[in-house]
Design a protein with these regions (language model features):
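The feature captures the beta-strand-to-loop junction immediately N-terminal to the Walker
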Residues: 20-22
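H-loop/switch region of ABC-family ATPase nucleotide-binding domains
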Residues: 190-191
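Catalytic Walker B motif of ABC-type/P-loop ATPase nucleotide-binding domains
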Residues: 154-157
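Conserved ABC ATPase signature
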Residues: 129-133, 137
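Helix-to-loop junction immediately C-terminal to a conserved catalytic motif
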Residues: 35
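Conserved ABC transporter NBD signature motif
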Residues: 43-51
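Conserved ABC ATPase "signature" region
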Residues: 51, 94-124
């Protein structure tokens, strides 16, 4: 069964975009298609000048090195320290015969990892084992690991899921601030309307196989967004699907 039938979307560099919609409308699937963890069977996905569907081998690896992903589950190695988990992020930068990651000395890699931990407020937890951290702290380490990758685009699939309200809000504030300060594009999936409005420039709602809502966040009100989830999304016109990161 096709989840997304019709989608035509362009995301400018540096924009923060919230993807919303009911379960099963394709939000997470869309993020997975962008990094080729799921395959689109029609249309094109263009990111930073690359047509994603045509990439193979080393070219696909180089592309993925430019896109940071934060999942619902942080996937930290529990027996390793927070610092060691962040250092693993440098592996995503090894995309060719000689990369800047390979040119760094171990001490330089460690120093950069510490800077990433400091950026998420966890420099003092660097030597703690990952399995001793709270859920919110673990997600912060995952964000630091993603920063170690030096991405140009960040995809976040419900990074606030399974966290208490305060921790979830802090994680979203952190993601928004870090990506905004670095001029990165942020696309995040959220089921929290307050987060979608507060941490995005633009809100896109999926429904009925396509885009049912596409509006600047400042122009969306709570009643409209609540109704978007409570009522069936209106149908959208057919067309050749395309997704472009400009």
């Amino acid at each position: 069964r096709r989840i997304i039938e019709r989608l035509d979307l362009t995301i400018p560099q540096g924009e923060s975009l919230a993807l919303i919609g009911a379960n099963g409308t394709g939000k997470s699937t869309l993020l997975r298609m962008i990094v080729r963890l799921a395959e689109a069977d029609a249309g094109t996905i263009s990111v930073l000048g690359d047509e994603v569907g045509s990439l193979r081998g080393a070219a696909l690896k180089r592309f993925r090195a430019r896109v940071g992903v934060v999942f619902q589950k942080h996937n930290l190695v529990s027996r390793l320290s927070a610092l060691s988990n962040v250092v693993h992020g440098v592996q995503s930068r090894r995309s060719g015969p000689r990369t800047w990651a390979q040119a760094l000395a171990p001490a330089e890699i460690r120093d950069e990892a510490m800077e990433c931990l400091a950026a998420v407020g966890l420099a003092d937890k660097a030597m703690q084992r990952a399995d001793s951290l709270s859920g919110g702290q673990s997600q912060r380490v995952a964000i630091a690991r993603m920063l170690m990758q030096r991405p140009q685009i960040v995809l976040a699939d419900e990074p606030d899921a399974s966290l208490d309200p305060r921790a979830g809000r802090e994680v979203m504030e952190l993601l928004f601030r870090l990506t905004r300060d670095k001029g990165l594009t942020l696309v995040f999936v959220s089921h929290h309307m307050a987060h979608a409005r507060r941490f995005s420039d633009r809100i896109v709602g999926l429904g009925n196989g396509g885009i049912a809502l596409d509006r600047r966040a400042l122009h969306c009100n709570e009643a409209e967004l609540a109704a978007f989830f409570e009522e069936p999304a209106e149908d959208v016109p057919a067309g050749q699907p395309a997704l472009v990161f400009a």
